[in-house]
Amino acid sequence: MTTEVLSGKPLAAIIQQRAHEETALLDDEGVRPVLAVVVATDDESTHWYVRSIERAAGRAGIGCRIIDLGHDATEQVLASVLADLSAEPTVHGIILQTPLPAAVRADRLVGLIAPEKDIDGANPLSLGRLAVGQPAFAPATAQAVVELLDHFQIPVAGRNVAVVGRSAVVGKPLSLLLLERDATVTICHSKSGPLERYTQPADVVVVAAGRTGLLKGSHLSPETVVIDVGTNVLPDGSLVGDVDEASVTGVAAGLSPVPGGVGSVTTALLLLHTVEAARQQSRSGLLTASTSRI
């Protein structure tokens, strides 16, 4: 069996172009979308990712402010910066980039991001709104998965989808987005037992556990579609996902690569969310856009 490569790059280009076009429309109204990214780490891969966001924002005409507080930033300093950015009218979107210093509680900080500027769905209010079907920005990585499935015309309505991982960033919000599309969702985690019990009956498997080589070909039935959300840095600096690509290739009907799959779509969605946030804030101050399909 030939396994289709579900590259995210063409979809990311479409989303980035849409962000650019909508930014131009806002520019005609005298509004320039601005994204603020708060960083508190010396992790080089994180800084590389943040720089990639900055470059992509520049191409779309979106302002991008990188607030680098250093790896020893305190929770109090981070809280003050987030509160100031939430109150700053010229900033439309805010990202609190992880990882954070060991002594810092991210769960206490994300609640300080104004929901209308929470373009990566980090505030618990955003996740709560998502759960009950109210307008809110979905976490960009979770939304990137469903956008990628839509782009390749892979249906989920009435089908079994196994989500491996239950984080508040991907697993939980993704399950909500899939339920909105009438999928039958199973969430797998470290206490679920043998993985194949849940992944073999699945039509679609999404892996977001942060464990290199977790999903193998033996865990799948033929024709399963696999979306790899994992981002694991190997000792040589290369990036791999959670899927054992060698054993899955030839079994799965489709597989998203790492890098070049979900990640590129995630970055593009962060930009589009920023533009949507700027539009709503400039016109009404109310958040009305979030999980609309591309």
From Swiss-Prot:
Q: Does the keyword Nucleotidyltransferase apply?
A: no
The record ties this protein, via Pfam families, to:
THF_DHG_CYH (PF00763), THF_DHG_CYH_C (PF02882)
Q: Which cysteines are joined by disulfide bonds?
A: none
Lineage top rank: taxon: Bacteria
Keyword Hydrolase set for record = yes
Supply the EC number(s).
1.5.1.5, 3.5.4.9
Question: Which cellular component terms (GO) are annotated to the entry?
Answer: cytosol
What reaction does this catalyse? (6R)-5,10-methylene-5,6,7,8-tetrahydrofolate + NADP(+) = (6R)-5,10-methenyltetrahydrofolate + NADPH; (6R)-5,10-methenyltetrahydrofolate + H2O = (6R)-10-formyltetrahydrofolate + H(+)
Q: What is an annotated GO biological process for this record, any one?
A: methionine biosynthetic process
Q: Mind listing the GO molecular function terms for this protein?
A: methenyltetrahydrofolate cyclohydrolase activity; methylenetetrahydrofolate dehydrogenase (NADP+) activity
Q: What pathway does this protein act in? A: One-carbon metabolism; tetrahydrofolate interconversion
Annotated keywords: Amino-acid biosynthesis, Histidine biosynthesis, Hydrolase, Methionine biosynthesis, Multifunctional enzyme, NADP, One-carbon metabolism, Oxidoreductase, Purine biosynthesis
What the record says about family reads: Belongs to the tetrahydrofolate dehydrogenase/cyclohydrolase family.
PANTHER family per record: C-1-TETRAHYDROFOLATE SYNTHASE, CYTOPLASMIC (PTHR48099:SF5), C-1-TETRAHYDROFOLATE SYNTHASE, CYTOPLASMIC-RELATED (PTHR48099)
Name of the protein in question: Bifunctional protein FolD 1
